[in-house]
């Protein structure tokens, strides 16, 4: 809910099971409450069921989908194609289906194939450049494309990472990734020479595209995704606010070109600052092409913002060369290295007392030395600022008010309660927001109600005009509407704009044709206001339920974009990359023409595999090598050789080692690196 309050147009959330974040589940009841809250602003709720599903879980998963539909979810993110083949048959045409990033979408051909299976939106691989995203958009201009813009990065293409399952029996495709890529490795050559010692060579920095949002918009991305796995509420507040404000700035800069997907402007009581939020250092990854500085080899942990360098150290304190303001309780850290070791470690401490730039830790850290860079990974003052109410989201409306001593000359059906000439009042309201399209409503609804304790009758009508309009009518006793003895304008405006306990705020009241000359009791104006709000709520809810003209299953089967055409060549050599974990998925791919529907890696190795285990699934075996590769475990666009400056193809220095290279864990398990220079890709494989 904090994400919606701080400007998100949509939120994605894991259900109790079957999400790609196993430890971040939410009950159906809680998701229903979130839907109710989000829909007030025209925002949407997307539920992740983006793991591969086993046969004995299949019916339970479908039952969960039905429950979630009943509580109002707007979209499902799916990975398992067997599940997709069933879900598309049971969800109503108001619920969207999104292809999770776990579907490994790198090309327009794959995106088109997914669209033909019934997906309405595709979440693209994080590794894509702006040019590659634009190529997909140009080929498929009607398909919604969603791009990651912020948060933790997986070093492997999502959906084709098996190293956690292989090493620890914990599958990334089942939402239980063991964070293999955050471990420290020795990098060794084929002769056993150590090139790097205990460095986090697969640990990437965090993504931040805050300065590239317009580029992404113009490339064809229609939705931006912020990763927030197990992050606290302060992270959500800060990051969502930063991106929402930047999007609004872009829309204001280019009126008419872009629009927001939900309603309401946010007033913030703090200034967002991404440097003060959990991060491992930031990178724009491959958005603008390959860069060397995308990984964080010294530590997989959050460094935070750079705040200066250690200047002078005393027994219980030290001085910092910095322009930052420090507070008691700040969390600081630094990178240290022993004189006799190549490895770097992160040391942290908390400030007990800050006197200007002189800091007194609770306990002086042993590795601190003059000249060292200092980082703040917990800003006490900023956290305190975020702990209270930090945002208010309101939908701006304009209200028109009119009154007449006459009833409507041509009453519509349902207006039989207004048959005399005692007079009418009316009001209509419109959402005012230049960042969105007007709300449209093409149906008409009439309703009469009468309060037996009052002499006034109310009538409300939703017109089929753009935007939302509401026309209640009022009848009075004793000769119709009475002229007021004193001006009524201020009271009319005051009563109609009392919207404090709603999601609305009135920016303007327009009183039509001198209607303020009549005396209207405040209680009647309050009831009129309530009716306006009630109808606006209905209009916004109806705005959510747009029918999706999804291709029928029969129609889908007519398209023969062969499965072999839409995935990298490794899929043909290694059919387990299709992640076939249930009978429905096997049947689906057989119908797609897949010649060998091999079981998923997790089915073949349910508890993982020990290094050196024999396998009938030999792949990428290289004759003459000392060690034969048996399994492709990760496909990475990140290249260690390039990042260390040894890519000759891109102008790096010539290596002094002999390939192949290996990553080695402290327990001596080894993983072979294969450099696919033609496709500019690094593969991580096990050895046997």
Language-model features: locations:
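Aromatic- and glycine-enriched glycan-recognition loops and surfaces
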Residues: 23-32
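Conserved phosphotransfer cores of two-component systems
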Residues: 91-92
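Short, glycine/polar-rich helix-capping loops at beta-to-alpha or helix-loop-helix junctions
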Residues: 106-110
């Amino acid at each position: 809910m904090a994400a919606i309050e701080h400007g998100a147009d949509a939120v994605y959330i894991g259900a109790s099971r079957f999400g790609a974040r196993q430890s971040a589940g939410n009950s159906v009841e809680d998701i229903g409450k979130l839907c109710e809250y989000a829909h007030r602003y025209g925002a949407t709720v997307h539920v992740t069921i983006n793991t591969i599903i086993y046969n004995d879980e299949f019916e339970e998963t479908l039952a969960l989908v039905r429950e979630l539909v009943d509580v109002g979810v707007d979209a499902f993110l799916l990975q398992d194609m067997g599940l997709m083949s069933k879900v598309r048959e049971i969800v109503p045409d108001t619920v969207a289906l999104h292809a999770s990033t776990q579907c490994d979408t790198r090309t327009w051909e794959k995106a088109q194939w997914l669209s033909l299976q019934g997906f309405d939106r595709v979440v693209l691989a994080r590794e894509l450049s702006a040019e590659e995203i634009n190529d997909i958009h140009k080929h498929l201009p009607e398909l919604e494309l969603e791009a990651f813009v912020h948060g933790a990065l997986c070093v492997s293409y999502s959906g084709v990472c098996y190293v956690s399952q292989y090493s620890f029996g914990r599958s990334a495709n089942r939402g239980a990734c063991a964070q293999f890529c955050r471990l420290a490795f020795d990098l060794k050559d084929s002769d056993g020479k150590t090139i790097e010692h205990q460095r986090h060579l697969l640990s990437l920095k965090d993504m931040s595209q805050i300065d590239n949002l317009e580029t992404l918009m113009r490339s064809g991305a229609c939705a931006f995704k912020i990763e927030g796995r197990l992050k606290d509420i302060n992270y959500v507040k800060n990051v969502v606010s930063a991106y929402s404000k930047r999007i609004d700035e872009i829309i204001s800069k280019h009126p008419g070109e872009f629009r927001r997907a939900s309603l309401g402007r946010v007033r913030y009581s703090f200034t967002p600052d991404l440097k003060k939020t959990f991060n491992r250092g930031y990178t724009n990854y491959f958005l603008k092409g390959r860069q060397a500085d995308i990984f964080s080899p010294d530590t997989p942990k959050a460094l935070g913002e750079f705040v200066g360098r250690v200047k002078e150290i005393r027994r219980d304190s030290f001085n910092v060369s910095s322009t930052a303001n420090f507070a008691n309780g700040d969390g600081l850290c630094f990178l240290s290295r022993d004189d006799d070791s190549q490895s770097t470690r992160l040391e942290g401490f908390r400030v007990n007392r800050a006197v200007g730039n002189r800091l007194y830790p609770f306990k002086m850290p042993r590795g601190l030395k003059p000249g060292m860079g200092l980082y703040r990974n917990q800003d006490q003052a900023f956290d305190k600022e975020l702990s209270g109410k930090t945002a208010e989201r309101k939908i701006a409306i304009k209200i028109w008010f009119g009154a007449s001593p006459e009833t409507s000359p041509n009453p519509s059906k349902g207006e039989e309660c207004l048959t005399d000439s005692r007079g009418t009042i009316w009001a209509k309201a419109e959402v005012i927001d230049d960042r969105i399209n007007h709300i449209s409503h093409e149906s008409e609804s009439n309703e009469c109600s009468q309060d037996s304790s009052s002499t006034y009758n109310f009538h409300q009508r939703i017109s089929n005009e753009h935007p939302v309009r509401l026309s209640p009518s009022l009848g009075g006793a004793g000769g119709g509407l009475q002229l007021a003895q004193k001006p009524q304008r201020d009271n009319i405006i005051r009563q109609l704009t009392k919207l404090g306990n709603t999601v609305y705020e009135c920016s303007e009241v327009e009183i039509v044709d001198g209607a303020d000359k009549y005396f209207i009791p405040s209680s009647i104006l309050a009831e009129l206001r309530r009716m306006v709000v009630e109808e606006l709520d209905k209009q916004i809810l109806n705005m959510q339920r747009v029918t999706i003209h999804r291709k029928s299953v029969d129609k889908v089967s007519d398209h023969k974009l062969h499965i072999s055409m839409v995935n990298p060549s490794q899929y043909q050599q290694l059919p387990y990359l299709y992640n076939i974990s249930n009978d429905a998925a096997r049947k689906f791919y057989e119908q797609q023409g897949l010649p060998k529907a091999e079981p998923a890696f997790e089915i073949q190795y349910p508890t993982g595999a020990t290094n050196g285990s024999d396998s009938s699934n030999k792949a990428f075996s290289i004759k003459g090598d000392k060690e034969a590769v048996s399994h492709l475990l990760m496909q990475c666009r990140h290249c260690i050789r390039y990042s260390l400056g040894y890519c000759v193809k891109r102008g790096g220095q010539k290596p002094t080692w002999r390939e192949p290279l290996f990553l080695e864990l402290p327990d001596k398990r080894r993983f072979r690196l294969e450099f696919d220079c033609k496709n500019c890709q690094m593969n991580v494989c096990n050895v046997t």
